[in-house]
From Swiss-Prot:
Sugar-modified residues: N22
Membrane topology annotation: Multi-pass membrane protein
Protein task: Golgi membrane protein involved in vesicular trafficking.
Transmembrane feature ranges: 27-47, 49-69, 98-114, 118-138
Pfam families: Cg6151-P (PF10233)
Protein keywords: Glycoprotein, Golgi apparatus, Membrane, Transmembrane, Transmembrane helix
PANTHER family in the record: CALCIUM CHANNEL FLOWER HOMOLOG (PTHR13314:SF2)
Naturally occurring in which organism (per UniProt): Eremothecium gossypii (strain ATCC 10895 / CBS 109.51 / FGSC 9923 / NRRL Y-1056) (Yeast)
Entry protein name: Golgi apparatus membrane protein TVP18
UniProt record, GO biological process: vesicle-mediated transport
Length: 167
């Protein structure tokens, strides 16, 4: 039994998300992009010989925080403190995510006062997520989880036998 990405990714669910016009879903998609931006550009900027290193480290930490905010299943998998889990679980509404992303973006915009670097892309990405979550909050839209990963009850979801075969 061959494994494919379609075993894990719910393509019809992704298309339904895009057609939903729910801004919390769009904010979550940009949140995934922000995770990659924060980690990649944080690592890339850590090689500067100025105070930009501090902002690069902050970007990496922001990326790690966003992983747990945007992929809540990791809170159950990873051994974390109860305080951290409680903090992340507080970000479960459009309004709170708007505030979180705005605060993270402000920190990265502050890095521009030292030197203009690629961390500007991180700040812009965080701002876009904040705008999407803020729009969802102002429109009083329900906060939705995305449909990217298949539900284990889905018949197309990979079963234990396939997992054993991979291992």
């Amino acid at each position: 039994m061959a494994l494919s990405w379609k075993s894990f990714v719910n393509v019809p669910g992704i298309l339904a998300d895009l057609r939903s016009f729910n801004f919390s879903v769009y904010g979550r998609w940009f949140g995934y992009i922000n995770i990659l931006l924060c980690l990649a550009l944080g690592i890339a900027n850590i090689f500067h010989f100025s105070i930009v290193i501090a902002f690069a480290i902050v970007a990496i930490v922001q990326g790690l925080l966003l992983i747990f905010v945007e992929v809540p299943i990791l809170l159950k998998i990873c051994p974390l403190s109860d305080n951290f889990i409680g903090l992340v679980k507080k970000c479960d509404t459009n309004g709170r995510r708007t505030l979180l992303y705005t605060a993270l973006a402000i920190v990265q915009y502050a890095s521009l006062s030292v030197q203009v670097t690629s961390l500007l892309a991180v700040a812009i990405g965080l701002t876009i997520s904040a705008i999407f979550y803020g729009t969802g909050y102002l429109k009083k839209q329900e906060f939705l989880e995305g449909n990217v990963i298949r539900n284990p009850t889905d018949p197309a979801f990979m079963r234990e036998a396939a997992v054993r075969e991979v291992l």
